[in-house]
Amino acid sequence: GTMPMIPRWALGYHQSRFSYSPDRRVIEIADTFRLKRIPCDAIWMDIDYMDGYRIFTFNPQGFPNPKAVNRDLHLRGFHSTWMIDPGAKVDPNYFVYKSGTENDIWVKTADGKDFNGDAWPGAAAFPDFTYPKANKWWQNLYKDFLAQGVDGVWNDVNEPQINDTPNKTMPEDNIHRGGGNLPAGKHIQYHNVYGFLMVKSSREGIMAVRPEKRPFILTRSNFLGGQRYAATWTGDNGSCWDHLKMSVPMSLTLGLSGQPISGADIGGFLFNADADLFGNWIGFGAFYPFARGHACAGTNNKEPWAFGKEIEDASRIALERRYILLPYFYTLMHEASTNGMPIMRPVFFSDPKDLSLRAEEEAFLIGDDLLIIPAFASQPALPKGIWKELSLVNGDTNDKYQAKMKIRGGSIIPTGKIIQNTTESSLDPLTLLVCLDEQGKASGSMYWDAGDGWSYKKGDYSLQQFTAERKDNKVIVKLTGKTGKGETENKDMAIVKVITEKGILHASGNLLEGIEVKL
């Protein structure tokens, strides 16, 4: 199956660290983004928000009122994502462990006892997600948790990671009971799908509590088909050039495996990052389908402003480019949800017959029409044909940290204005970027809906088709098709920018009547 539509805010920039704590530090980070006018949509809470690393709890000292934290983030145009790991602290006075034990839902050892393994809270028990009763129990835990105003959920260390075993995960002879259409079996049989079964259960629990909204779940472990339940990131990378470069083929491979929303921790998670590394990373990482900055405990601050003015300015440019392209990313998310096409694509997708493109791991495509060449790329193999360099933000082509962007001949890319977060209106105005092919023609489309909820399934969306054609000394751009009963803010009005050898030529008007751009 394909990935269902995610909420639009999840295509914005995310800021995380292990950990923002206490609650006032979370709000301070949010306020700094707004003060510095660096676009951002979500702040992430790692395990320090919990009471002694007990899942589904809040630290009474650092986060005495999580509902107020979420309210204050929402007032600033942010969404929040909070971590939930699989391991529950072995503590007879802790409600999750107590109810899990009473319901007998834990994974068992080979001799039939509850398996306890060392995790963040110390000794922990682990739900058996093959067992229907365990899933029902797990799903019910989300009711009170989401009632605090939590937006997204982060299921981490769900391989599962166990610190006191030789293989750093469950013993292979642990027992999963199965049920429904899953047979009983040893952990060696179920290891690769433990995280997958966890996020499936989490999604079902979130949907039961909040059926009117689209869930957003991020997972570290997943499996083929898991895109139906969660986005997948590349895990605990390090602040080093090898991991920066490796993130491109890793994200591409996730996309080719059916998981369209993926990315690496921008700046690197482990170890300290320096300014040059971070600037280079966000310069192309802003184009990951899932774009999030993250940092490990004990490492330096890695927010966009943490490395001085030059990197702060470079980060702002990179993220402004991302937000201008939001209508294009959202259209590609819709495509992924309908036919499974990845958002981030290998360059050989543009010309499968050109075997020289097959091994390219530095440059990549966003959709069919946008070529991204990271600043670190040395002699990347690029597709032939018309690809014109594109500038979206003042200074973006002169900044040494920014990836080069090229638009494909024959394409029309929908873009919006610079916004600080997705609660603001993108399409006021809509700008269409046009690059003609050898025949003087171009086409493109835009998908738009409410950004959350399921009304698009009942026709509340707008899927618009655009064409451009050169006639004599002008290019005429038109809206040539529209499906769905939804309206977009621009009401058929648009700015058109035709990218030519002479530079960018502009015009504006009504797309139904046709917009003429004089050459």
Give names to the regions the model predicted.
Residues G410-L511, L519:
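Accessory, solvent-exposed terminal regions and/or long lumenal/extracellular loops of proteins
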Residues G1-Q402, K406:
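Catalytic-domain carbohydrate-binding cleft regions of carbohydrate-active enzymes
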Residues N398-Q402, N510-L519:
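Solvent-exposed, conformationally flexible loop/turn segments
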